């Protein structure tokens, strides 16, 4: 078994995505009379669905920014994973036909990526959107380790433009998509793997994850902390690192 280690240091359980939905309901009320811009991960379909639900409840149209966001939303609608009423999503060129307070922008850029839609808005380089004091912006994500400075720069520029900006440390607008300790322990208890390789995280996260498995009774010899490029071999009796290939 290989398992995500990102939240292996966090005790307890990961909060429900419904927490974010409840926050959106309150924030949409708070943003009455303003244009709403929400940046989140394009892969989080449930998060997008909650934004759609709030837009419908508040009689707002939705405009989508960012290639990955457009691709994911269109595919999710096509496959039936995302329920969007006909006519709710409008083309970018049609935004000016609606009052700003009747629009929700869903955009990429929650990690401060320099070429993302939100970053270009913040730097006043987006051809469709100019940030004004009438904008209410929600960054519905936590900075991935290493992206903190990029996100802070975007937030600062949005604030300088006069917008109100909401982010996770201020409000419950994000919950992790990674399992915390109790969920990891439940998974290990249910699956009872013979071999275990913690993945996805810094070394400290992999180390903590391996410790959880050993504390639950796994043989330490069957828990491997691998580095990028390690070759791992198993003969059904034993598992070990046997070599290295060029990677990264």
Per-segment meaning from a language model:
Residues 1-248:
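Acidic/His-rich, metal-assisted hydrolase cores and their charged scaffolds
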């Amino acid at each position: 078994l290989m398992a995500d280690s990102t939240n292996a240091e966090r005790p307890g359980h990961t909060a429900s995505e419904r927490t974010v939905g409840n926050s959106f309901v309150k924030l949409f009320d708070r943003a009455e009379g303003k244009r709403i811009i929400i940046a989140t991960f394009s892969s989080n379909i449930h998060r997008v669905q909650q934004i759609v639900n709030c837009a419908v409840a508040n009689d707002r149209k939705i405009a989508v920014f960012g290639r990955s966001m457009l691709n994911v939303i269109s595919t999710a609608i096509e496959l039936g994973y995302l329920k969007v009423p006909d006519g709710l999503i409008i083309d970018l060129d049609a935004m000016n036909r609606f009052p700003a307070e009747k629009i929700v922008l869903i955009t990429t850029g929650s990690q401060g990526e320099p070429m993302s839609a939100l970053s270009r808005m913040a730097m006043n380089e987006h051809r469709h959107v100019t940030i004004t004091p009438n904008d209410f912006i929600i960054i519905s994500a936590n900075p991935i380790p290493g992206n903190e400075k990029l996100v802070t720069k975007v937030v600062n520029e949005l604030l300088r433009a006069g917008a109100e900006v909401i982010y996770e440390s201020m409000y419950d607008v994000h919950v992790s998509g990674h399992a915390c300790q109790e969920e990891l322990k439940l998974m290990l208890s249910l699956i009872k793997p013979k071999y275990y390789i913690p993945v996805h995280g810094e070394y400290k996260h992999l180390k903590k994850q391996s410790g959880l498995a050993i504390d639950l009774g796994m043989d330490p010899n069957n828990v491997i902390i691998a580095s990028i490029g390690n070759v791992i071999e198993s003969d059904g009796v034993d598992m070990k690192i046997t070599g290295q290939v060029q990677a990264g």
